[in-house]
């Protein structure tokens, strides 16, 4: 298994601590006036999502986590698990609710997304940055309601609620940024 020295730490690096995979969020190199230099690191546990702050002496090394980001196709949900498939090998993986988390409201069947695997177990699911979804329910926008451009809430086919401009109607397809949850454009 590969090891990373503290000099190789950077955001996004996946490391193994106490038997759990962690992703480095922030890394700060500190050289005090007196004493040994150290790295102050903020890490997120990929299994639980908890964020911790750890310090490593300069020159320490940590084990690399065997974490892979894989492009997979979302197939279906059986109520308890969300099932994904690798398109090339047709290998299927079932992810629990903790792994899918907020991605639930952006996923529709046959969509491609990135699944983070650790020892063959899905840890996290990342939807594509932009998704195109149909509006299933929204109030009609009445002309003259506002002086400037206003917005109204709209429910999408996946159940997510997004604020859309008044001119967007029920049944239309809209593009949504999944990172912010905001309306981008009509399709």
From Swiss-Prot:
Intracellular or extracellular location(s): Cytoplasm
Name of the protein this chain belongs to: Elongation factor P
SMART domains: EFP, Elong-fact-P_C
HAMAP family found in the cross-reference section: EF_P
Gene symbol of the encoding locus: efp
The family this protein is said to belong to: Belongs to the elongation factor P family.
PTM comment, free text: May be beta-lysylated on the epsilon-amino group of Lys-34 by the combined action of EpmA and EpmB, and then hydroxylated on the C5 position of the same residue by EpmC (if this protein is present). Lysylation is critical for the stimulatory effect of EF-P on peptide-bond formation. The lysylation moiety may extend toward the peptidyltransferase center and stabilize the terminal 3-CCA end of the tRNA. Hydroxylation of the C5 position on Lys-34 may allow additional potential stabilizing hydrogen-bond interactions with the P-tRNA.
Annotated pathway: Protein biosynthesis; polypeptide chain elongation
Biological process annotations from GO: peptide biosynthetic process
Statement: the UniProt record of this protein carries the keyword Cytoplasm: yes
Keywords: Cytoplasm, Elongation factor, Hydroxylation, Protein biosynthesis
PTM annotation (N6-(3,6-diaminohexanoyl)-5-hydroxylysine): residues: 34
Pfam family, one: EFP_N
Functional summary from the UniProt entry: Involved in peptide bond synthesis. Alleviates ribosome stalling that occurs when 3 or more consecutive Pro residues or the sequence PPG is present in a protein, possibly by augmenting the peptidyl transferase activity of the ribosome. Modification of Lys-34 is required for alleviation.
GO molecular function annotations of the record: translation elongation factor activity
Listed GO CC annotations: cytoplasm
Domain of life of the native organism: Bacteria
InterPro entries: Elong-fact-P_C (IPR015365), NA-bd_OB-fold (IPR012340), Rib_uL2_dom2 (IPR014722), Transl_elong_fac_P/YeiP (IPR020599), Transl_elong_KOW-like (IPR013185), Transl_elong_P/YeiP_cen (IPR001059), Transl_elong_P/YeiP_CS (IPR013852), Transl_elongation_fac_P (IPR011768)
Major localization listed first in the record, in broad terms: cytoplasm
PANTHER family the record matches: ELONGATION FACTOR P, ELONGATION FACTOR P (EF-P) FAMILY PROTEIN
Coiled-coil annotated spans: none
Organism: Thioalkalivibrio sulfidiphilus (strain HL-EbGR7)
Gene3D superfamilies referenced in this protein's UniProt entry, alphabetically: 2.30.30.30, Nucleic acid-binding proteins
């Amino acid at each position: 298994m590969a090891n990373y020295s503290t000099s190789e730490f950077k955001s996004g690096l996946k490391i193994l601590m106490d038997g759990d995979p962690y992703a480095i969020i922030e890394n700060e190199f500190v050289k005090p006036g007196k004493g040994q230099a150290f790295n102050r690191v903020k890490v997120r546990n990929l299994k639980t999502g908890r964020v911790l702050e750890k310090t490593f002496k300069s020159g320490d090394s940590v084990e690399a986590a065997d974490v892979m980001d894989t492009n997979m196709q979302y197939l279906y949900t059986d109520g308890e698990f969300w099932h994904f498939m690798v398109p090339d090998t047709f290998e299927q993986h079932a992810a629990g609710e903790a792994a899918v988390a907020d991605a639930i409201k952006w996923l529709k069947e046959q969509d491609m997304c990135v699944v983070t695997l650790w020892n063959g177990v899905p840890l996290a699911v990342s939807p594509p940055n932009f998704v195109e979804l149909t509006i299933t329910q929204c109030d009609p926008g009445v002309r003259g309601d506002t002086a400037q451009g206003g917005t109204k809430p709209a429910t999408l086919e996946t159940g997510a609620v997004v604020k859309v401009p008044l001119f967007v109607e029920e049944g239309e397809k809209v593009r949504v940024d999944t990172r912010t949850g905001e309306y981008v454009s009509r399709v």
